[in-house]
């Protein structure tokens, strides 16, 4: 009888653990927003912007993320890029899209000699067209691929 209960309870326990694991996992779309969206501010030449934001957005835990870009536009405008000019991603995938106009961004690059846990970044505000990879339903940005100068 005890064996019968174990046979029923073990798969149920595994199922519960799988569901709980999925609930706690950040979606790719949410990760994109955490790592790249800063709609509430404008690009800043403040030299500490990247140091503060990279730490605040959990990109300096366990290692220093070498490069990151923050976009200072409304989320809906960045989401709309998924329906603009289709381009090939750096990795060869075909789910990237380029914004039709320039956006305000801030590039953060790890400075030479900077090592974890003392991650130090160079802050570079720019106006560039952005390239993002999109997927899902709804179709939304899940990866920041690049920024390019506006050729117009």
Curated annotation (Swiss-Prot):
Any one GO cellular component localisation term in the record: extracellular region
Subcellular localization, as worded in the UniProt entry: Secreted
Region forming the signal peptide: 1-24
MF GO annotations: lyase activity; nucleic acid binding; ribonuclease A activity
Glycosylation sites: 46, 112
Protein family: Belongs to the pancreatic ribonuclease family.
Function: Endonuclease that catalyzes the cleavage of RNA on the 3' side of pyrimidine nucleotides. Acts on single-stranded and double-stranded RNA.
UniProt name for this protein: Ribonuclease pancreatic
Gene: RNASE1
């Amino acid at each position: 009888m005890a064996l019968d209960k174990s046979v029923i309870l073990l798969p149920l326990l595994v199922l519960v653990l799988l569901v709980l694991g999925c609930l706690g996992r950040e979606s790719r779309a949410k990760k994109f927003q955490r790592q790249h969206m800063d709609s509430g501010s404008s690009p800043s030449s403040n030299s500490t912007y990247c140091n503060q934001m990279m730490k605040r957005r959990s990109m300096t835990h366990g290692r220093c993320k070498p490069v990151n870009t923050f976009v200072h536009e409304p989320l809906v405008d960045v989401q709309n890029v998924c329906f603009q000019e289709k381009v090939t991603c750096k990795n060869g995938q075909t789910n990237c899209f380029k914004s039709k106009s320039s956006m305000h961004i801030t590039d953060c690059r790890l400075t030479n000699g900077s090592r974890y846990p003392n991650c130090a970044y160079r802050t570079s505000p720019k106006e560039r067209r952005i390239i993002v990879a999109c997927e899902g339903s709804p179709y939304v940005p899940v990866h920041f691929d690049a920024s390019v100068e506006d050729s117009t």
